[in-house]
Swiss-Prot record:
GO terms for cellular component: nucleoplasm; nucleus; tRNA-splicing ligase complex. The lineage of its organism: Eukaryota, Metazoa, Chordata, Craniata, Vertebrata. Its main location: nucleus. GO terms for biological process: embryonic morphogenesis. It comes from the Eukaryota. The keyword tRNA processing does not apply. Residues 206-224 have a biased composition (Basic and acidic residues). This is Ashwin. It is found in: Nucleus. It comes from Mus musculus (Mouse). The modification Phosphoserine is found at residues 112, 182, 184, 189, 193. Component of the tRNA-splicing ligase complex.
Amino acid sequence: MAGDVGGRSCTDAELLLHPELLSQEFLLLTLEQKNIAVENEVRVNKDNLTDLYVQHAIPLPQRDLPKNRWGKMMEKKREHHEVKNDTKRSSAVDGLRKRPLIVFDGSSTSTSIKVKRTENGADDRLKPLAQIGSTSDAFWKSPNSSSRISPLVLFSNLPVNHKMEHNNNDTQQNHDLMNRKSPSGPVKSPPLSPVGTTPVKLKRAAPKEEAEATNHLKPPEVKRKIQHVTWP
């Protein structure tokens, strides 16, 4: 059963919500199916049938409640139920929204951002490590530069060079002393030691003057200075 309401087609369910559009026979049939007693006076008048239908047969919550105690109690429950549904709907919408909406207004662009600068903060961090000292400057030179040699190589080579110079001086002095003390005649070689005997090595003690001279000739040992690298 379908009809037209306001120039548009309506389904049967929509017609049940508008009893004024229903026929008198349909209203009586609906009330009888609901087991609602209808008096003879009410059967004759369609307006009375419509009121009875709205009171007992129309789908909830469009149904009109009676003006008694039970009707007032049901009306309060209906209002409470509607308020609860509204709160549930609003909470569901808020739950779906991950974060609150940001409303942009032009006033936020007028704020200025201030950056606090320290006296030595960023400048010290941007300084290269080569400015720490001259030794570190030489150390951080690339290996391709042939003009300067890293101080580590110089420090490692110094003791070896001093030892070789000292040994050369000792051999030269020993040679001069032997020529001075040896006679003009031929030098006799010592007899060969027999087999099985171990040769005895004699050490000649150098005089005090020569020892002092060698000590003066020996350059002072250069101590390797430990450079502590401090990171900014």
